[in-house]
Amino acid sequence: MQTIGDVELERVQRLLPDSALQLIDVLGWPATARLISAFGGATLSAKSGVRAERSGGVHKLLRSVLTEDESKALTRYLGGAPFYIPRCDQALRTLRNARFLSELHQQQGTGHSIRQSLALLCPRYGISDRYAWRLIRERYNSQLLKSPTQVGLFD
């Protein structure tokens, strides 16, 4: 499980699905980040009253991640209907890749070669070295500066 912070989540707002943006409107950035980190990809049913015990203890699960007020706000908003906590795959992948590249740069700063760094970091980040090389190449290509004489020639 990849945990994400509210600041990181805010950085990738454009990649979030509408359902995540709705949760942000109800709960705010910090609570939504905690909710996605804990339950992303799961459908929960927050029934209240007599049917609460049939919900599988969702209220208890929510309170393990959200404050009492946040949990109540979410339950009020949903009205007891089942709800899907989005995984936010694209946003999480973007954050993971940024973390990976940052740590790769740090490893190289300590004297490790790229290949040594990849051997250490790829398993930790759950990516293959081929994917890592693609990330490195994409970053390199995005940082290349156009020649001043070529700027705007074909744009």
PLM region descriptions:
Residues 93-115:
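Short, amphipathic alpha-helical "recognition" segments used to contact nucleic acids or chromatin
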Residues 15-22, 57-61, 117-120:
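A general alpha-helix detector
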Residues 53-71:
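Acidic (E/D-rich), amphipathic helical modules within compact regulatory domains
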Residues 23, 110-127, 132:
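Short alpha-helical "recognition helix" segments of helix-turn-helix
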Residues 136-139:
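DNA major-groove recognition helix of helix-turn-helix
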